[in-house]
């Protein structure tokens, strides 16, 4: 943390990853309103940070302001699959160059995802194996490709380089695996990310059963006014379990939620709700993990669960 930002006169390009959360406790503006980019990328809009933006309208307004911050004659690379993003782009300034993107062409073979673009000047279709998977990741890669294109990086250069990209930290992080089992943990906690992450794992391993755990840990996810945003988000999992710690709610000084509220909000009758982390360990120990994957999603730690130990035990169990 000694050097969180470094700017030099010799750098011709500066890349910032920022979001709509507050710049600091004393500067209540969203971080991304301070950047004034020449090239902006907008990947999607899904309501979050209810403690700062209590209504969806107030949340959406920040993204409108973000687009307005783009420099004169700048570029906006945006995901056209997101209806909220599309609606904002329609009303963007006329001097802004609009560059849409969506899910690229790909295929999955033997648990590996390949990008399959048609590159100009090549006889055969390109085939690029990736270390990441899931349509949300592939869509983001496509957006990154178009940003790179604006600064002179060719598509072929991008595709060759992206095959070594291991993904963002704490996103679909492989904890353990055996020939017929895989255990992933992921930072997903917002409804859209939970849904996308579960769908990614299920699509990558369609023949395997998937058990997915989600810890409600953030202020938004534990707020009764936000819980309904999670409706249907875990439906793709074969077994879905939500965990929350009532003591965390007390610590955050928000109104308590009940197991019944959680189950109703997720709109899945078979959903299980745990409030004691010991129940998680017991559940995992009682399952058969042959041809069966485990996914654990949280911005926290499931109250200190030892992921590495669980992974090692499950691998031994499946050998």
Where on the chain are the PLM-derived regions?
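Switch II of P-loop NTPase G domains
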Residues: 21-36, 192-200
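Acidic, Mg2+-coordinating active-site environments of NTP-dependent enzymes
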Residues: 15, 36-183, 207-208, 260-264, ...
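ATP-dependent carboxylate-amine ligase
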Residues: 39, 64, 90-97, 143-319
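Switch II (G3) loop of P-loop NTPases
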Residues: 13-25, 183-189
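Short gly/ser/thr-rich secondary-structure transition/capping motifs
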Residues: 1, 18-26, 58-61, 100, ...
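Short, glycine/acidic-enriched loop or turn micro-motifs at the edges of active sites
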Residues: 20-22, 46-47, 82, 188-190, ...
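Conserved phosphate-binding catalytic cores of ATP/NTP-utilizing and phosphoryl-transfer enzymes
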Residues: 1-6, 137
């Amino acid at each position: 943390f000694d050097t969180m930002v470094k700017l030099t006169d010799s750098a011709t390009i500066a890349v910032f990853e920022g979001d709509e959360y507050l710049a600091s406790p004393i500067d209540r503006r969203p971080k991304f309103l301070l950047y004034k980019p020449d090239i902006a990328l907008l990947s999607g809009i899904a309501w979050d940070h209810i403690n700062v933006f209590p209504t969806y309208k107030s949340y959406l307004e920040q993204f409108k302001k973000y687009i307005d911050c783009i420099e004169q004659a700048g570029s906006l690379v945006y995901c056209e699959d997101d209806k909220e993003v599309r609606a904002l782009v329609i009303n963007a300034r006329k001097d802004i160059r609009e560059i849409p993107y969506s899910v690229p062409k790909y295929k999955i073979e033997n648990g590996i995802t390949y990008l399959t673009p048609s590159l100009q000047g090549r006889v055969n279709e390109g085939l690029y194996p990736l270390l990441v998977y899931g349509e949300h990741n592939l869509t983001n890669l496509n957006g990154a490709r178009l940003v790179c294109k604006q600064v002179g990086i060719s598509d072929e250069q991008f595709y060759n380089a992206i095959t070594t990209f291991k993904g963002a930290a704490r996103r679909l992080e492989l904890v353990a695996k055996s020939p017929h089992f895989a255990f992933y943990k992921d930072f997903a906690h917002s409804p859209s990310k939970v849904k996308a992450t579960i769908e990614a794992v299920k699509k990558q391993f369609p023949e395997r059963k998937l058990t997915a755990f989600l810890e409600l840990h953030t202020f938004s996810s534990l707020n009764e006014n936000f819980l309904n945003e999670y409706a249907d988000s875990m439906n793709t999992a074969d077994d879905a379990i939500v965990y929350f710690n009532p003591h965390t709610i007390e610590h955050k000084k928000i109104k308590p939620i009940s197991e019944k509220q959680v189950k109703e909000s997720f709109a899945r009758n078979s959903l299980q709700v745990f409030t004691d982390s010991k129940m998680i360990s017991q559940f995992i120990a009682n399952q058969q993990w042959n041809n069966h994957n485990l996914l654990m999603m949280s911005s926290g730690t499931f109250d200190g669960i030892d992921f590495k130990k669980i992974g090692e035990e499950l691998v031994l169990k499946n050998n």
